[in-house]
Swiss-Prot record:
GO molecular function per UniProt: 1-deoxy-D-xylulose-5-phosphate reductoisomerase activity; manganese ion binding; NADPH binding
Pathway: Isoprenoid biosynthesis; isopentenyl diphosphate biosynthesis via DXP pathway; isopentenyl diphosphate from 1-deoxy-D-xylulose 5-phosphate: step 1/6
The EC number(s) this enzyme carries: 1.1.1.267
Organism name: Xanthomonas oryzae pv. oryzae (strain PXO99A)
EC class name: oxidoreductase
Cofactor dependency: Mg(2+); Mn(2+)
GO biological process, one term: isopentenyl diphosphate biosynthetic process, methylerythritol 4-phosphate pathway involved in terpenoid biosynthetic process
Protein name listed in UniProt: 1-deoxy-D-xylulose 5-phosphate reductoisomerase
Pfam families: DXP_redisom_C, DXP_reductoisom, DXPR_C
Binding site for 1-deoxy-D-xylulose 5-phosphate: K130, S156, E157, S182, H205, S218, N223, K224, E227
Family classification: Belongs to the DXR family.
Amino acid sequence: MAGSSLRQVAVFGATGSIGASALDVIARHPERLRASVLSAGSKVEDLLALCAAHRPAHAVIADAALYPALRDGLRALGLATQAHAGAEALDALAGSDACDTVVAAIVGAAGLPSTLAAARAGKRLLLANKESLVLAGELLTRTATAAGAEIIPIDSEHSAIFQCLRSCDAGRGVRRVILTASGGPFRGRDRAALAAVTPAQAVAHPKWSMGPKISVDSATLMNKGLEVIEAHHLFGLPGEQIDVLVHPQSLVHSLVEFVDGSTLAQLGLPDMRTTLAVGLAWPERVESGVGGLDLLSQGRLDFEAPDTAAFPCLRLAWDALRAGGTAPAVLNAANEVAVSAFLQGQVGFLAIPALVEHALTTLPRHNADTLDTLLFADAQARQVTERALAHHALHA
């Protein structure tokens, strides 16, 4: 981007942890990056504080009832930032000339429409919303290709693969990719010990600072399962060419093995600002605020196979990928409902994979031809899982 104009960046999900990391990187490079659009779900006060700090042209609150609070708050701050509310406003801005780059960091299936809108408009899409790929990966990648949109993954694992693959003309020379997993806070525990896990314990991740939903997904290994499905869509690889290794130090973010016997790995400290800096500046490199990796002080790098008996969510994700069609959408939706119930104390930790498996075995698989089909599968999976929860409550 040397000598070019400012990159106009929309940060969707600005009040979350990924949004904060993105804004940190953007603020370090005022000569090349500008936060032009900021969005939040319902945290209007947090959004106003971010607007005061970054002075975007547009601010969006997803909860339309909070529009007056956002509008009046911006006026009170003396900001020229234009207030918007609702999902339609978000989608419109994603596709408008208000931005050329979108950081898609809205959690859950709610982030899909704006992600698709950005892809349709040919934007550079920094994808942190894994549900977009899991729910509608085929549709999203097809849309992006047709419109010339560039998808750069922000997950540390997929960013690592992206960087390794872009280091050469890989073509058909990839034998397999290996995603690494920290193993979560309960690595090494058996199912009996996992039965007693509390929500507070599950959200305390040993390596990464994350929101509650993704922290639980990391603890169940569903996060890694979703990443396997993502990798399939991002890099065009079948499930048989995607492996997972548990790596407790979280320093090797992923590896790519080539047909000539070479293996490339990307290493770095566990900080999302690195991958966001990659996405914001690619193919250039810019300062992210993250220090270098001192391997001597780290001491050792350990690797082990994931325990899919204790953590069946990873196996369920592979099953859904093999089934194809709407199965990944069902997996994702059932998991969202199950994790929410666990965080609210309605069910135990082991109920999460049980509820997901129930939805996968109950609902028929359909071809994932349209967004409507996928959203219908998503809604069905939520209903089936909610009914299973109600049944659980009656018999608890």
